[in-house]
C-alpha cells in the first residue's frame, strides 16, 4: 500500500489558522460508513446522530505551553519544544539551534529559568530544569501550535487550543476533535442519555511528522503515553450490554482504545503505544468516530480510511474540499460510522 494513495489537493485557503468565534460553530460532514452516504450539517447537529445508551469516549489530556525560546549560555539562540515531561524537573525535547547543544551545556530561557542538557536520545534531548517544569512552562512557555497554522501563538490559543474537559497535563498537541465541544453541548448530549468516559493520551509532536517511506507497511509510529482505566473498560462493557455504540471523540481516543484491545479483548492499560492503524487493520472497540479533517498522506487519514473505507473516505474529502470545509486543528469536523467491510486502495478497480 503506497503513501501516495492518500494524497489529495488542498487549497491553502481551506487551512484554518484561527478558531471560530464559538467552539460549536464548525460544520459537520456526516459519513455513513456502510453506504458512503454524506450529509452536510452543523456541529450541534451531532445530537441528531447520537442515541440514548451510546457511550462517548473523550481524551482528557491537557496541552502544555511546550515551546520555549532562549539561548545557550555560550551564545546562540535556540528553540525548545518539549516532547515529554519525565518528572518534576526533567523533559525530553526537540531543540532547534544552528548548532546542537552538547551534554553539560546550559540553556537560558527567555522570561527566566534555565536548564542543563544532560543526555541525548537519538533526535531528542534530555533537559533538567533548575525549577519545576510545569509551573515554568505556564509562566514563560508558548502554546505549541501545529506548523501548518504558520503564525505565532496568541493569548487566545491558551484557551482555544485546549478542550473544555482537559485535565491531565502532558500533551504538546491538542486532541482537536474535542475542541468543538462546549459545556452547553456536552450538557445536551448528557440530557439525551448518552454516557461519557475519559481516556488519556498525551499527544506528542510526532503527530505532525510526515510519513517518510513509500510503502505504508514500512512506517514506524512514534511512541505516546496513554492510559485506559478500568472504569472505561467497565463503561464500555455496560454500553455493549445495553446495545449502545462506543463513539470515540478523536483519533487519539481511537488509538487509546484499540491499543488497550490489541489482542481483541479490551483491558485496562497504562503505558506507551506505537499502534499504527491503516486499511486492513481491524477495530475491536470503536463503532463511530468524531474527527477533524487531516493532512494529505498522514497516518491519521490512513486511520480514518481503515475505519470508513478508503474509497468512502477519499470521496468524503473531495466533497469537503468542493464545499469549502475548513481543514486541520482549528477546522471543521466529521462524524463517521464504521464500515463493517472497508476496502483499501488495493481493492480499487
UniProtKB/Swiss-Prot annotation:
**Catalyzed chemical reaction(s):** 7-aminomethyl-7-carbaguanosine(34) in tRNA + S-adenosyl-L-methionine = epoxyqueuosine(34) in tRNA + adenine + L-methionine + 2 H(+)
What species is given as this protein's source? Answer: Pseudomonas putida (strain ATCC 700007 / DSM 6899 / JCM 31910 / BCRC 17059 / LMG 24140 / F1)
Report whether Transferase shows up as a keyword of the record: yes
Pathway listed for it? tRNA modification; tRNA-queuosine biosynthesis
Q: Which PANTHER family match?
A: S-ADENOSYLMETHIONINE:TRNA RIBOSYLTRANSFERASE-ISOMERASE
Q: How does it assemble?
A: Monomer.
Q: What is this protein called?
A: S-adenosylmethionine:tRNA ribosyltransferase-isomerase
Q: Name one GO molecular function term.
A: S-adenosylmethionine:tRNA ribosyltransferase-isomerase activity
Protein origin, superkingdom: Bacteria
Main location as per UniProt: cytoplasm
Amino acid at each position: 500500500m503506497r503513501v501516495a494513495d492518500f494524497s489529495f489537493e488542498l487549497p491553502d485557503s481551506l487551512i484554518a489558522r484561527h478558531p471560530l468565534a464559538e467552539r460549536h460553530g464548525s460544520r459537520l460532514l456526516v459519513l455513513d460508513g456502510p453506504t458512503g452516504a454524506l450529509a452536510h450539517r452543523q456541529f450541534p447537529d451531532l445530537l441528531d446522530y447520537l442515541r440514548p445508551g451510546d457511550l462517548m469516549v473523550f481524551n482528557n489530556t491537557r496541552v502544555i505551553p511546550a515551546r520555549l525560546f532562549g539561548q545557550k549560555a555560550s551564545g546562540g539562540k535556540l528553540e525548545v519544544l518539549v516532547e515529554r515531561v519525565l518528572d518534576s524537573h526533567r523533559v525530553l525535547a526537540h531543540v532547534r539551534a544552528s548548532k546542537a547543544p552538547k551534554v553539560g551545556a546550559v540553556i537560558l530561557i527567555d522570561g527566566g529559568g534555565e536548564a542543563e542538557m544532560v543526555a541525548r536520545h537519538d533526535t531528542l534531548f534530555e533537559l533538567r530544569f533548575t525549577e519545576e517544569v510545569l509551573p515554568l512552562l505556564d509562566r514563560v512557555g508558548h502554546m505549541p501550535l501545529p506548523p501548518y497554522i504558520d503564525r505565532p501563538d496568541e493569548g487566545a490559543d491558551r484557551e482555544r487550543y485546549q478542550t473544555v474537559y482537559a485535565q491531565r497535563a502532558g500533551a504538546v498537541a491538542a486532541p482537536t476533535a474535542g475542541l468543538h465541544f462546549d459545556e452547553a453541548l456536552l450538557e445536551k448530549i448528557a440530557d439525551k442519555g448518552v454516557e461519557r468516559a475519559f481516556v488519556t493520551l498525551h499527544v506528542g509532536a510526532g503527530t505532525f511528522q510526515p510519513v517518510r517511506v513509500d510503502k505504508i507497511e514500512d512506517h514506524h509510529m512514534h511512541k505516546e503515553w496513554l492510559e485506559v482505566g478500568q472504569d472505561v473498560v467497565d463503561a464500555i462493557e455496560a454500553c455493549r450490554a445495553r446495545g449502545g455504540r462506543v463513539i470515540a471523540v478523536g483519533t487519539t481516543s481511537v488509538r487509546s482504545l484499540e491499543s488497550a484491545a490489541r489482542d481483541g479483548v479490551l483491558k485496562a492499560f497504562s503505558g506507551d503505544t506505537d499502534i499504527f492503524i491503516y486499511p486492513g487493520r481491524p477495530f475491536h472497540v470503536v463503532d463511530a468516530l468524531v474527527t477533524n479533517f487531516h493532512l494529505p498522506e498522514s497516518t491519521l487519514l490512513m486511520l480514518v480510511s481503515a475505519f470508513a473505507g478508503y474509497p468512502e473516505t477519499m470521496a468524503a474529502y473531495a466533497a469537503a474540499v468542493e464545499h469549502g470545509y475548513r481543514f486541520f486543528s482549528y477546522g471543521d469536523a466529521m462524524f463517521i460510522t464504521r464500515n463493517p467491510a472497508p476496502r483499501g486502495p488495493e481493492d480499487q478497480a
